[in-house]
Amino acid sequence: MGRLVGLELSNFKSYRGVTKVGFGESNFTSIIGPNGSGKSNMMDAISFVLGVRSNHLRSNILKDLIYRGVLNDENSDDYDNEGAASSNPQSAYVKAFYQKGNKLVELMRIISRNGDTSYKIDGKTVSYKDYSIFLENENILIKAKNFLVFQGDVEQIAAQSPVELSRMFEEVSGSIQYKKEYEELKEKIEKLSKSATESIKNRRRIHGELKTYKEGINKNEEYRKQLDKKNELQKFQALWQLYHLEQQKEELTDKLSALNSEISSLKGKINNEMKSLQRSKSSFVKESAVISKQKSKLDYIFKDKEKLVSDLRLIKVPQQAAGKRISHIEKRIESLQKDLQRQKTYVERFETQLKVVTRSKEAFEEEIKQSARNYDKFKLNENDLKTYNCLHEKYLTEGGSILEEKIAVLNNDKREIQEELERFNKRADISKRRITEELSITGEKLDTQLNDLRVSLNEKNALHTERLHELKKLQSDIESANNQEYDLNFKLRETLVKIDDLSANQRETMKERKLRENIAMLKRFFPGVKGLVHDLCHPKKEKYGLAVSTILGKNFDSVIVENLTVAQECIAFLKKQRAGTASFIPLDTIETELPTLSLPDSQDYILSINAIDYEPEYEKAMQYVCGDSIICNTLNIAKDLKWKKGIRGKLVTIEGALIHKAGLMTGGISGDANNRWDKEEYQSLMSLKDKLLIQIDELSNGQRSNSIRAREVENSVSLLNSDIANLRTQVTQQKRSLDENRLEIKYHNDLIEKEIQPKITELKKKLDDLENTKDNLVKEKEALQNNIFKEFTSKIGFTIKEYENHSGELMRQQSKELQQLQKQILTVENKLQFETDRLSTTQRRYEKAQKDLENAQVEMKSLEEQEYAIEMKIGSIESKLEEHKNHLDELQKKFVTKQSELNSSEDILEDMNSNLQVLKRERDGIKEDIEKFDLERVTALKNCKISNINIPISSETTIDDLPISSTDNEAITISNSIDINYKGLPKKYKENNTDSARKELEQKIHEVEEILNELQPNARALERYDEAEGRFEVINNETEQLKAEEKKILNQFLKIKKKRKELFEKTFDYVSDHLDAIYRELTKNPNSNVELAGGNASLTIEDEDEPFNAGIKYHATPPLKRFKDMEYLSGGEKTVAALALLFAINSYQPSPFFVLDEVDAALDITNVQRIAAYIRRHRNPDLQFIVISLKNTMFEKSDALVGVYRQQQENSSKIITLDLSNYAE
């Protein structure tokens, strides 16, 4: 393979004029330079000359790649148009010198100011296609950009989605060249497949039409026969319905006349009884007012007592608070006394320290003055000073210089050790002061507070236990009273229910009692008697009660018996005993069918038989009384089922509204109560009610105070629970704080003993060793000075040591020590001032606490006096309360007697009114039934008219005179004037008015209708059959053509898919096989010899069948890290992973050179070293690396350097190169 040996840039971006760059024989070249110098422009130049588009070169349009100079100010006198023009050239080019074997190929790309670009190879202009073919032959893929990595591309690769990564593999593998053809063929297949499927569906549909039309021709004749049969059956059904409606109406008319006479007689009796009752009520109201007034007085007195008791408890709360406040203040005073004593000790200690330091300062100042007085004694004249200087130079020459230097080094070391020793002494002093002045004091306070909290907690627990015992006793008393009250209320509720039943339905109760006595008697004599219908069934839900009673109707009080023989024997027995009448339902002879609902299940309606509970043995009887009736939630639902859904059965709403089978709508009737008692039982119930009310009232009054006290105790327990929980939390927190305080004291002691003190000892030892060494050197220095300055010292009269000791160095040392003493005095004064201020503050707090204690004691005394006064008032009120209770008891006894007398009169009147209402309801029911039968007759006749049913008429008025649109009185009159001839109705239908006859006719009509519905005649069946046969031939030919074309295109598609998949998988398999090894090498510790050291990396295809249409997941696991997705890796880890992928892809179709622009930007030093080491290992004559980098860890490993810098005067980037192969690593 070839290599890139050099570049030549002319006016390209920041490079003005012609700039040449040579890479020589280097296989690892680094381009370096400061930011903004033009390094990345070099990358753009390489990309530009190799055909990369401008949008990848950080420029929107090509002309922006031409160098642009800086124009001078237009107002300048030196402005030169020609110079300005030359600084902005009109074109630019880049040449790349590519070594291919022994031949050097010159690649050139030119760009003009108007945006035109051209390409040359060895000076010959070629097209872009030829230019790119030449590069592709050298494995330089322009579209895949396998030869370069732009700045920022590494981060983009690491952040790529699986689909984007798959797209990159397509470009590298070359499978993308088949993408367009693949998608076009796939689209054609989908269209052809859709068309063929649609055509097959049409063919099947037309074939079905042929069969349908053929069958329709055969059904037309059968349809005509069945239609005639249906008309005859509908005629019989209409005659049967009209005949029985007329019979039922005649029976009801006779019964209505008898009821009207009985109602008139009962009304007279009621008027006489009401006048007598009014007189009794007036007397009763007056006595009731007296009792109410007495109860009100008793309530007011009781409320006054409750208020005083509440006030007494309210006094207890501030009493307890005042007691706690006094105890708290006393403990605070004790604590403040300790603080005062301790702070006075601190003040005395710092005053003593201040005196000691001040005396030391005064003594040192006197010493300085004495040294100043001796200064003139050791002063040299000018000649002696010259002599001293000459001798001093001789001294330095003969070894004094070395000694002075050693002594200076020792002094410096000594000063550093002293400073460090002073720091450790300060740390020890700080820790000791922290322990004595803060932590110990805080610990004492925390310990005291903890003991106080424990005492408070024990007191609260004791009080909580006492309150719980009291609360349990109160709750036990209240529960016992509540149970008694519940029992009494339950009895009262039962009594009231029974009273309501008896008072509202007195007549009906007597009838029901008589009926039940008869049934009980029949059960004794005839074992086959089962019981009353309403006793043997009941609604599943309470809301169905009214609807079920409406449906049962006259069968509500019917008697279910085992067979017809038992029923006949029972009827004969009742006649013989003159015991009244009853209806019987024999289980063996009644004919029923299982009711079914020809509608989807819904919560809006339900079959009546499904709404009741009963024993399985009575199922036949329940089917008989319920029939196929339906219970609906609302009237609108019932109307919808009747007239829109065509339901023929009876429809009843839960409010009692009824729609008959014939379409007649009537109101519902209320269900009767279950328990009915006679008049004597009613009187005993009223007496029991009054007695229960008095007992409940007495029990409630007795428990009122207990309930109030229980609530107060319960609130107190709740508050105590909260206080105990808070105190326990505080105790825990206080323990934790105390443990932390002790732990901190231990920490500071351990710090002093184990760390600071050993270090101080060590430093002192070092200081002693330095002093000994210094003394030896000083002695050696003095010996040398005495030898050299011997004659001179004899002349001046004092030694050189004495002279030097009284020089400027001594004065500076004394000044420094004096400053240290002054600083120490200032520190002690500040501490003394702080402690003095703190002592004053504590003293003020102590005085305030004393005053607070006096105020709390005064408040406590006042509260005790208030408590005594309230207790006296409570005693007085309790006596008054007892007196009023006794008076109320006497009044209530008299009231009960009067109430019993009044109840007796009301019961008599209520019985009469109840009987009257029963008669009126019965009369209204008969009227409604007559109207119902009239409406059903009108409806039946209308149905005949609408359905064209010809029934025989013997009157002049016919059904043609009946209006269809309305059902008013006129329509009923017309209906009643129509006489129908029933001779054509068979005898069995005249005698049978049961559901079996109706269902038999309906079943026959339904069977015929089903046959007619199945036949569905089609008059044009033959004509349409011929038409469909022609269309089937056309669509069949079209379908076969589409299937053949689909097969042809599918074969072409599979070939293209195979080529595309093979190219893609070949690239993927290669990269996947080499990726892990490359990543392991990039992440391996350079010092590790383990073969499998480093991280792991892998690629996974999401779709094995069409990998190019799905994504590729890239997973990289750095060394010693657990597995996680790429997005959760750090920036450096992502960069290394991306580089491993790039290197693996490059190794598949290796380009002759690989240019990397600042790929190490996000890497730390270790990873940069690994990348550099990888490049050095893999560089070779067939693989040249050119790296743009700012990090010396990278470029110091390269074979050659290309330096880029900015020439500010020319406003241009410049190049310098350096071959590193001549230098040792």
UniProtKB/Swiss-Prot annotation:
Present with 5710 molecules/cell in log phase SD medium. Its main location: nucleus. The lineage of its organism: Eukaryota, Fungi, Dikarya, Ascomycota, Saccharomycotina. GO terms for biological process: cell division; double-strand break repair; establishment of meiotic sister chromatid cohesion; establishment of mitotic sister chromatid cohesion; mitotic sister chromatid cohesion; mitotic sister chromatid segregation; sister chromatid cohesion. Involved in chromosome cohesion during cell cycle and in DNA repair. Central component of cohesin complex. The cohesin complex is required for the cohesion of sister chromatids after DNA replication. The cohesin complex apparently forms a large proteinaceous ring within which sister chromatids can be trapped. At anaphase, the complex is cleaved and dissociates from chromatin, allowing sister chromatids to segregate. The keyword ATP-binding applies. It is found in: Nucleus; Chromosome. The gene is SMC1. This is Structural maintenance of chromosomes protein 1. Keywords: ATP-binding, Cell cycle, Cell division, Chromosome, Coiled coil, Mitosis, Nucleotide-binding, Nucleus. It comes from Saccharomyces cerevisiae (strain ATCC 204508 / S288c). SUPFAM superfamilies: P-loop containing nucleoside triphosphate hydrolases (SSF52540), Smc hinge domain (SSF75553), Tropomyosin (SSF57997). Belongs to the SMC family. SMC1 subfamily. It comes from the Eukaryota. Residues 173-489, 679-1063 form a coiled coil. Residues 527-641 form the SMC hinge domain.
